[in-house]
Structure formats: structure tokens, C-alpha cells
């Protein structure tokens, strides 16, 4: 579960979130809605621990309080975020990136097993053959980087307590929506929590039963 109490957040002198509170139980998906500028993406980034955001209040998951932890420790505690615009990383290829994730997150498996698994994930999400050797830099499109990040989410499912999805379908083809739905359902089946921000009407309707409207928060 994740419990957020009296969470406020600002970037520089601009306060974006003010005393937000909610709880998401294991196996639930929370749809976060609100007008542009209401802080939907900022809420996810605050939970993830983006360093330029100043936050106060409480963010608790099963492993404890997160509010004072840096981003990498929140990741190790079981929080994963799929970004609306995943950053490019110079000087590293995709396979090296996954090896680093395996090391940091202490995921079991040999290098050959990791290569086999990641290749199958890349095929599943629709990335081109040989993707594991591609540089993870500006040569990769935004859609390709987003697909790559979604495969990371699948790879880390067993360790993820809280999955943060910021416009996961943005910039992707229509066929990717079902894969996002599958990812959300599998996370819920494993008693993880999902926080979803999306402008996709079908996804909004599908997950509208449990909703936080920041326009009325």
C-alpha cells in the first residue's frame, strides 16, 4: 500500500501541491485527474523523489517512510516510475542499462538469462531487433525510450510495491494500450499499487472507480 498524508510540494518559489492526502491499498489502481497545471505529474515525481522538488508531509509504503529518502533509495524500496518523457542517457547501451538495474535492484539471474529475458521483453513491447545493443541516447525516439522504460517496469515487477505511470500511452501506437493494461493488472495481481495519470479516455474510464481529482483537492 501507499499512504500519503498532508503532502505539499514546490519547485523553486512555486507551490504546486498543498496538503494532499490519500491511501491506495494493495492491488488497487488510483487514477489521478485534474486540469493542466494541477500537479498530476508533479505528484508522481514527488513520490519518486525528484531532487528539484521540495516536499513536506508523509509518504509511506510497506517498507516505511519515504519523504526524506533520495530517489535511488525509493527505487530500492520498491517504487518505480515510467515517465511521460523518459530521459536520454549518453554513453550507455540498453543492455548495459539493464545490467546496472539488475545490480542495483539485486535481481537474481545470470547475464545470459538477462539477455534472453530482455530480448523477449523488447519483442513483446514492439522494439526493433537488436535493440539491446542500441545506445540509449538521443538517437532513440521518445516512443522507443518510453517502451524501454515499460519493459523495465515488467522486469522489476516482483520488486515493485508502487508503480507510477505518467501518461504511459502518450506517443505510443494504439496497440500498446493493451500492454499497459496488462502491466497494471499484473502489478495489481501481485498486490502492488498503481498510480496512473493519463489523458486516454478509454484508460480513464477503465480505472475511474478509484480516483483522485487534484482539481478539487
Regions found by a protein language model. Name each.
Residues 33-35:
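The feature captures the beta-strand-to-loop junction immediately N-terminal to the Walker
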Residues 197-199:
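H-loop/switch region of ABC-family ATPase nucleotide-binding domains
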